[in-house]
Amino acid sequence: MVFGILNVTPDSFSDGGNFVSTEAALAQADRLISEGADAVDIGGESTRPGAKPVPARDELKRVLPVIRGIRSRWAEIPISIDTVKADVARAALAEGASIVNDVSGMSLDPEMPGVCAEAGCSVVLMHSRGSVSDMASYDNAVYGDDPVGEVISELEESIQLAQSAGIHPTKIAVDPGIGFSKKTGHSLAVLVELQRVVALGYPVFIGASRKRVIAELIRYTTVTGSPSAGTTLAPQMISHDDRDMTTVGVNVVALYSGARIFRVHRVRPNRLALDAAWALTPEEADMFAR
Protein backbone atom coordinates (compact mmCIF):
# COMPACT_ATOMS: atom_id res chain seq x y z
CA MET A 1 0.00 0.00 0.00
CA VAL A 2 1.11 3.55 -0.72
CA PHE A 3 0.00 6.31 1.65
CA GLY A 4 0.17 9.82 0.21
CA ILE A 5 1.36 12.44 2.70
CA LEU A 6 -0.81 15.51 3.20
CA ASN A 7 0.66 17.88 5.78
CA VAL A 8 -1.72 20.72 6.58
CA THR A 9 0.82 22.40 8.83
CA PRO A 10 2.58 25.75 8.47
CA ASP A 11 5.90 24.42 9.77
CA SER A 12 6.61 20.88 8.53
CA PHE A 13 10.20 20.48 7.32
CA SER A 14 9.43 19.31 3.81
CA ASP A 15 6.24 21.05 2.74
CA GLY A 16 5.14 23.23 5.62
CA GLY A 17 2.79 26.00 4.51
CA ASN A 18 2.07 24.54 1.08
CA PHE A 19 -1.33 23.10 1.97
CA VAL A 20 -2.62 25.15 4.89
CA SER A 21 -5.74 26.29 3.02
CA THR A 22 -8.47 23.72 2.58
CA GLU A 23 -8.55 24.38 -1.17
CA ALA A 24 -4.81 23.74 -1.56
CA ALA A 25 -5.01 20.65 0.64
CA LEU A 26 -7.87 19.18 -1.37
CA ALA A 27 -6.06 19.88 -4.63
CA GLN A 28 -3.06 18.00 -3.27
CA ALA A 29 -5.30 15.14 -2.11
CA ASP A 30 -6.72 14.93 -5.63
CA ARG A 31 -3.17 14.77 -6.98
CA LEU A 32 -2.09 12.04 -4.55
CA ILE A 33 -5.14 9.91 -5.30
CA SER A 34 -4.92 10.38 -9.07
CA GLU A 35 -1.27 9.25 -8.93
CA GLY A 36 -2.29 6.00 -7.26
CA ALA A 37 -2.34 6.52 -3.51
CA ASP A 38 -4.15 3.75 -1.66
CA ALA A 39 -4.79 6.09 1.28
CA VAL A 40 -4.21 9.71 2.30
CA ASP A 41 -2.35 10.39 5.55
CA ILE A 42 -3.34 13.78 6.98
CA GLY A 43 -1.23 15.50 9.62
CA GLY A 44 -1.97 18.73 11.45
CA GLU A 45 1.03 18.89 13.78
CA SER A 46 4.67 19.05 12.76
CA THR A 47 7.20 16.67 14.33
CA ARG A 48 10.29 18.46 13.06
CA PRO A 49 12.94 19.08 15.75
CA GLY A 50 11.95 22.03 17.91
CA ALA A 51 8.37 22.20 16.65
CA LYS A 52 5.99 23.72 19.16
CA PRO A 53 3.12 21.50 20.38
CA VAL A 54 -0.22 22.34 18.77
CA PRO A 55 -3.38 22.47 20.92
CA ALA A 56 -5.99 19.90 19.92
CA ARG A 57 -8.47 22.61 18.91
CA ASP A 58 -5.98 24.10 16.43
CA GLU A 59 -5.05 20.69 15.05
CA LEU A 60 -8.74 19.93 14.52
CA LYS A 61 -9.27 23.23 12.70
CA ARG A 62 -6.55 22.18 10.27
CA VAL A 63 -7.53 18.58 9.61
CA LEU A 64 -11.32 18.29 9.88
CA PRO A 65 -12.25 20.45 6.86
CA VAL A 66 -9.79 18.46 4.76
CA ILE A 67 -11.15 15.12 5.94
CA ARG A 68 -14.69 16.26 5.14
CA GLY A 69 -13.62 17.52 1.73
CA ILE A 70 -11.83 14.31 0.80
CA ARG A 71 -14.71 12.19 2.03
CA SER A 72 -17.20 14.20 -0.05
CA ARG A 73 -15.07 13.82 -3.20
CA TRP A 74 -13.69 10.32 -2.67
CA ALA A 75 -16.15 8.19 -0.73
CA GLU A 76 -14.04 5.04 -0.70
CA ILE A 77 -10.45 6.25 -0.25
CA PRO A 78 -9.10 5.36 3.22
CA ILE A 79 -8.08 8.37 5.30
CA SER A 80 -5.36 8.12 7.93
CA ILE A 81 -5.10 10.74 10.67
CA ASP A 82 -1.53 11.37 11.80
CA THR A 83 -1.91 12.46 15.43
CA VAL A 84 -0.81 11.66 18.97
CA LYS A 85 -3.96 13.12 20.54
CA ALA A 86 -7.00 11.01 21.39
CA ASP A 87 -9.38 13.96 21.00
CA VAL A 88 -8.13 14.60 17.47
CA ALA A 89 -8.30 10.92 16.58
CA ARG A 90 -11.85 10.62 17.93
CA ALA A 91 -13.10 13.61 15.92
CA ALA A 92 -11.27 12.54 12.76
CA LEU A 93 -12.70 9.03 12.96
CA ALA A 94 -16.18 10.47 13.39
CA GLU A 95 -15.71 12.49 10.18
CA GLY A 96 -14.61 9.53 8.08
CA ALA A 97 -11.00 8.64 8.86
CA SER A 98 -10.47 4.92 9.36
CA ILE A 99 -6.79 4.72 10.37
CA VAL A 100 -4.90 6.37 13.23
CA ASN A 101 -1.17 6.86 12.61
CA ASP A 102 0.30 7.59 16.04
CA VAL A 103 3.97 8.55 15.82
CA SER A 104 4.33 8.11 19.58
CA GLY A 105 3.24 4.48 19.49
CA MET A 106 0.32 5.49 21.73
CA SER A 107 2.73 6.55 24.49
CA LEU A 108 1.80 10.24 24.78
CA ASP A 109 -1.97 10.14 25.33
CA PRO A 110 -3.29 7.42 27.66
CA GLU A 111 -6.75 7.72 26.09
CA MET A 112 -5.57 6.90 22.57
CA PRO A 113 -5.67 3.07 22.83
CA GLY A 114 -9.24 3.14 24.16
CA VAL A 115 -10.44 5.57 21.50
CA CYS A 116 -9.04 3.39 18.72
CA ALA A 117 -10.37 0.19 20.27
CA GLU A 118 -13.86 1.64 20.60
CA ALA A 119 -13.83 2.85 17.00
CA GLY A 120 -12.51 -0.46 15.69
CA CYS A 121 -10.11 1.42 13.43
CA SER A 122 -6.75 0.33 12.11
CA VAL A 123 -3.66 1.78 13.81
CA VAL A 124 -0.05 2.41 12.89
CA LEU A 125 2.26 2.20 15.90
CA MET A 126 5.52 4.04 15.28
CA HIS A 127 8.69 3.75 17.30
CA SER A 128 9.89 7.01 18.79
CA ARG A 129 11.01 8.44 22.10
CA GLY A 130 10.23 11.71 23.82
CA SER A 131 7.71 14.40 22.98
CA VAL A 132 6.45 15.75 19.67
CA SER A 133 9.01 18.55 19.94
CA ASP A 134 12.07 16.34 20.28
CA MET A 135 11.20 12.89 18.94
CA ALA A 136 12.83 13.71 15.58
CA SER A 137 15.99 15.08 17.20
CA TYR A 138 19.08 13.15 18.28
CA ASP A 139 18.46 13.88 21.97
CA ASN A 140 16.77 10.52 22.53
CA ALA A 141 18.93 8.54 20.09
CA VAL A 142 20.90 6.67 22.75
CA TYR A 143 21.25 2.94 22.08
CA GLY A 144 23.44 0.05 23.13
CA ASP A 145 25.07 -2.56 20.94
CA ASP A 146 21.79 -3.66 19.32
CA PRO A 147 19.73 -0.60 18.35
CA VAL A 148 17.38 -2.64 16.17
CA GLY A 149 16.67 -4.97 19.07
CA GLU A 150 15.81 -1.97 21.26
CA VAL A 151 13.47 -0.60 18.59
CA ILE A 152 11.74 -3.97 18.37
CA SER A 153 11.43 -4.24 22.15
CA GLU A 154 9.85 -0.79 22.38
CA LEU A 155 7.50 -1.58 19.49
CA GLU A 156 6.41 -4.67 21.40
CA GLU A 157 5.49 -2.41 24.32
CA SER A 158 3.28 -0.34 22.00
CA ILE A 159 1.69 -3.49 20.59
CA GLN A 160 0.94 -4.73 24.11
CA LEU A 161 -0.57 -1.36 25.00
CA ALA A 162 -2.84 -1.48 21.97
CA GLN A 163 -3.93 -5.07 22.44
CA SER A 164 -4.56 -4.60 26.15
CA ALA A 165 -7.05 -1.86 25.25
CA GLY A 166 -8.89 -4.22 22.92
CA ILE A 167 -7.38 -3.37 19.53
CA HIS A 168 -7.43 -6.54 17.46
CA PRO A 169 -4.03 -7.75 16.20
CA THR A 170 -5.27 -7.66 12.60
CA LYS A 171 -5.83 -3.90 12.98
CA ILE A 172 -2.20 -3.19 13.88
CA ALA A 173 0.72 -2.14 11.65
CA VAL A 174 4.15 -1.22 13.00
CA ASP A 175 6.50 1.54 11.88
CA PRO A 176 10.16 1.34 13.02
CA GLY A 177 10.32 5.14 12.90
CA ILE A 178 13.01 5.93 10.34
CA GLY A 179 14.51 9.28 11.33
CA PHE A 180 12.74 9.45 14.68
CA SER A 181 14.86 9.24 17.84
CA LYS A 182 17.60 7.77 15.68
CA LYS A 183 20.85 8.97 14.23
CA THR A 184 21.58 8.13 10.61
CA GLY A 185 23.42 4.95 11.55
CA HIS A 186 20.50 3.74 13.64
CA SER A 187 18.00 4.34 10.83
CA LEU A 188 20.25 2.58 8.33
CA ALA A 189 20.61 -0.36 10.71
CA VAL A 190 16.83 -0.64 10.92
CA LEU A 191 16.54 -0.65 7.13
CA VAL A 192 19.33 -3.21 6.70
CA GLU A 193 17.87 -5.47 9.40
CA LEU A 194 14.24 -4.80 8.57
CA GLN A 195 13.41 -8.51 8.43
CA ARG A 196 13.76 -8.56 12.21
CA VAL A 197 10.94 -6.02 12.45
CA VAL A 198 8.89 -8.00 9.93
CA ALA A 199 9.32 -11.05 12.17
CA LEU A 200 7.06 -9.38 14.74
CA GLY A 201 4.23 -10.60 12.52
CA TYR A 202 2.52 -7.28 11.77
CA PRO A 203 2.45 -5.32 8.50
CA VAL A 204 5.50 -3.05 8.44
CA PHE A 205 4.98 0.61 7.57
CA ILE A 206 7.93 2.65 6.25
CA GLY A 207 8.02 6.44 6.35
CA ALA A 208 11.48 7.31 5.02
CA SER A 209 10.30 9.88 2.47
CA ARG A 210 12.56 12.96 2.34
CA LYS A 211 14.04 12.18 5.75
CA ARG A 212 17.53 13.26 6.78
CA VAL A 213 18.73 9.68 6.33
CA ILE A 214 17.74 9.93 2.66
CA ALA A 215 19.82 13.08 2.30
CA GLU A 216 22.75 11.38 4.01
CA LEU A 217 22.53 8.46 1.58
CA ILE A 218 22.67 10.93 -1.31
CA ARG A 219 25.66 12.76 0.18
CA TYR A 220 27.74 9.63 0.50
CA THR A 221 26.61 7.73 -2.58
CA THR A 222 27.57 8.76 -6.11
CA VAL A 223 24.58 8.57 -8.43
CA THR A 224 25.14 9.57 -12.04
CA GLY A 225 22.96 12.48 -13.05
CA SER A 226 22.06 13.54 -9.54
CA PRO A 227 23.43 17.06 -9.11
CA SER A 228 23.65 16.94 -5.32
CA ALA A 229 24.88 13.36 -4.94
CA GLY A 230 28.36 12.55 -3.72
CA THR A 231 28.84 16.09 -2.42
CA THR A 232 29.47 17.70 0.93
CA LEU A 233 26.25 19.68 0.77
CA ALA A 234 24.42 20.04 4.05
CA PRO A 235 21.35 17.78 4.11
CA GLN A 236 18.98 20.74 3.99
CA MET A 237 20.53 21.81 0.67
CA ILE A 238 19.67 18.56 -1.11
CA SER A 239 16.66 18.92 -3.37
CA HIS A 240 13.26 17.34 -2.87
CA ASP A 241 13.59 15.73 -6.31
CA ASP A 242 16.78 13.94 -5.31
CA ARG A 243 15.29 12.92 -1.98
CA ASP A 244 12.16 11.62 -3.70
CA MET A 245 14.05 9.49 -6.20
CA THR A 246 16.29 8.07 -3.49
CA THR A 247 13.21 7.34 -1.39
CA VAL A 248 11.95 5.14 -4.22
CA GLY A 249 15.12 3.05 -4.08
CA VAL A 250 14.96 2.70 -0.31
CA ASN A 251 11.31 1.68 -0.47
CA VAL A 252 11.94 -1.00 -3.09
CA VAL A 253 14.67 -2.51 -0.91
CA ALA A 254 12.32 -2.33 2.08
CA LEU A 255 9.62 -4.08 0.05
CA TYR A 256 11.96 -6.98 -0.64
CA SER A 257 12.79 -7.09 3.07
CA GLY A 258 9.10 -7.52 3.87
CA ALA A 259 7.66 -4.02 4.32
CA ARG A 260 4.18 -3.61 2.87
CA ILE A 261 3.04 -0.02 3.54
CA PHE A 262 4.90 3.08 2.37
CA ARG A 263 4.23 6.70 3.35
CA VAL A 264 5.49 9.07 0.64
CA HIS A 265 5.34 12.68 -0.52
CA ARG A 266 5.38 11.80 -4.24
CA VAL A 267 3.09 8.93 -5.06
CA ARG A 268 3.56 8.19 -8.75
CA PRO A 269 7.26 7.18 -8.85
CA ASN A 270 6.78 5.03 -5.76
CA ARG A 271 3.60 3.49 -7.12
CA LEU A 272 5.28 2.52 -10.39
CA ALA A 273 8.47 1.22 -8.81
CA LEU A 274 6.79 -0.71 -6.00
CA ASP A 275 4.26 -2.30 -8.35
CA ALA A 276 7.05 -3.36 -10.71
CA ALA A 277 9.16 -4.67 -7.84
CA TRP A 278 6.19 -6.61 -6.47
CA ALA A 279 5.56 -8.14 -9.90
CA LEU A 280 9.10 -9.53 -9.78
CA THR A 281 8.66 -11.34 -6.48
CA PRO A 282 8.70 -15.13 -6.99
CA GLU A 283 4.96 -15.57 -6.41
CA GLU A 284 3.90 -12.71 -8.66
CA ALA A 285 6.50 -13.41 -11.36
CA ASP A 286 5.20 -16.97 -11.63
CA MET A 287 1.65 -15.70 -12.11
CA PHE A 288 2.87 -13.11 -14.65
CA ALA A 289 4.67 -15.79 -16.66
CA ARG A 290 1.43 -17.72 -17.03
PLM regions: where:
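Active-site-adjacent loop and "lid" segments of alpha/beta metabolic enzymes
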Residues: 13-28, 47-72, 78, 83-87, ...
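N-terminal glycine-rich anion-binding loops that anchor highly charged ligand groups
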Residues: 1-4, 31-44
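Pocket-edge structural micro-motifs
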Residues: 4-5, 208
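Short polar catalytic/cofactor-binding loops
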Residues: 7-11
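Short acidic capping loops at alpha-helix termini that bridge into adjacent secondary structure
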Residues: 168-171
